[in-house]
Amino acid sequence: MRLTAPALPILSPHGHTDPQWYADNAPFPDASALFITPDHYVFRMLYSQGVPLEALGIPPRADAAAGSRAGGAVETDARKIWHRFAAHWPLFRGTPTRVWLDHAFHEGFGIRERLEPANADAIFDRINAALATPEFRPRALFERFNIEVITTTESPIDTLEHLVGEIEARQRG
């Protein structure tokens, strides 16, 4: 669709993005924080194959029933998380998630090689170098991709408090 109407803006009714990304416009910390920890399709696939969520930087839910998920130490080393992801990359073969990741790596970061343990550090570093630039901040990406509207898949009970100031400023004119 994008090839047939490249100049038209994107109206996304189902964006897997955190609205706070746009409110804060802070740089994404690293490749793992962009591609793994916020993406339930990625971390659920890994979890379904025996990778503990804590090993992916996902803390136990505060509202989880006692004993429903015995949590170990939550991994905070983004590079280790990325290496786990790379080691399990073949799990994504033939999935929509793999199509999306390949597209993001190719089009967003110019990465043409397949992710694997042997090149995990090089790809992690390449993505991180790009994320450190102003061109890869959330609002810059929003503009670059010609997104006019994005509705997020945030929790329906999210108060969106982080957007109050921006909304009030727009109303004042």
PLM region spans:
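Metal-cofactor-binding active-site regions of metalloenzymes
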Residues: M1-P9, G15-G173
